[in-house]
Amino acid sequence: MIATIVTSVSIIFVVLGALISAFAATGLIRLRDVYSRAHAAGKAATLGAMFLLFGAFLYFIGTEGYVNMQLIIGIIFVFITGPLSSHLIMKAAYNIKTPYTKDTKIDEIKEDMKHTKL
């Protein structure tokens, strides 16, 4: 009984992760500039991958009865590297003066960069 519930919850997490990853892929295709694309990749793809890994983690607990440490390490790795990589991509794009879209109104980074030494 409990194995069926855990398996059902793990399937829900895997499906949610796949849907969020599909939304992230759509954002990468449809968004206009590198800043928006990096934001979509950093936020949505990271959350989607974490849901997929957590669903697999729950599945192994429910069906096999053991904790898979590789999945825990994978979740932690994705949690750290996803937002960090998108931040570095946006910072590099800003430093080489990649243009914004026409819809961008305010450059908040310029004020922050005045007080930062590179």
Curated annotation (Swiss-Prot):
Origin superkingdom: Bacteria
Naturally occurring in which organism (per UniProt): Staphylococcus epidermidis (strain ATCC 35984 / DSM 28319 / BCRC 17069 / CCUG 31568 / BM 3577 / RP62A)
Biological role stated in the UniProt entry: Mnh complex is a Na(+)/H(+) antiporter involved in Na(+) excretion.
A molecular function GO annotation: sodium:proton antiporter activity
Broad class of the protein's primary localization: membrane
Record-given protein name: Na(+)/H(+) antiporter subunit G1
A Gene Ontology cellular-component term: plasma membrane
Family listed: Belongs to the CPA3 antiporters (TC 2.A.63) subunit G family.
Family annotation (InterPro entries): PhaG_MnhG_YufB
Subunit structure: May form a heterooligomeric complex that consists of seven subunits: mnhA1, mnhB1, mnhC1, mnhD1, mnhE1, mnhF1 and mnhG1.
Transmembrane segments annotated in the record for this chain: 9-29, 47-67, 69-89
Locations listed in the record: Cell membrane
